[in-house]
């Protein structure tokens, strides 16, 4: 995972690179991890039901070093992420 201020380059299992925009990041004290919500550049984030949103745990890079995306490992993690997502969507609806 390479990233700038608001973008990351995600490399899939086939070695294909895709530039993605970071929607938001957060940390979970319960799981001791950082998480990032992101979507492909070019997809407009106006309707979250129509935009493919990805989420991964991540280890930030230090200095010039690249960070690393990690898979979500448990059902409990997914439940926590879903709560964070629902809160984010509710806040967006209020704006």
Swiss-Prot record:
It comes from Geobacillus sp. (strain WCH70). It holds the Pfam family DUF1292. Transmembrane segments: none annotated. This is UPF0473 protein GWCH70_2487. Belongs to the UPF0473 family.
């Amino acid at each position: 995972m390479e990233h700038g201020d608001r973008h990351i380059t995600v490399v899939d299992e086939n070695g294909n690179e895709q530039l993605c925009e970071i929607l938001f990041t957060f940390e979970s004290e319960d799981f001791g991890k950082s998480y990032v919500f992101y979507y492909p550049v070019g997809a407009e984030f106006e309707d979250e039901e129509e935009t493919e949103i990805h989420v991964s745990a991540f280890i930030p890079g230090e200095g010039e070093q690249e960070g690393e995306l990690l898979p979500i490992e448990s059902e409990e993690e997914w439940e926590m992420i879903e709560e964070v997502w629902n809160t984010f969507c509710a806040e967006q609806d209020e704006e």
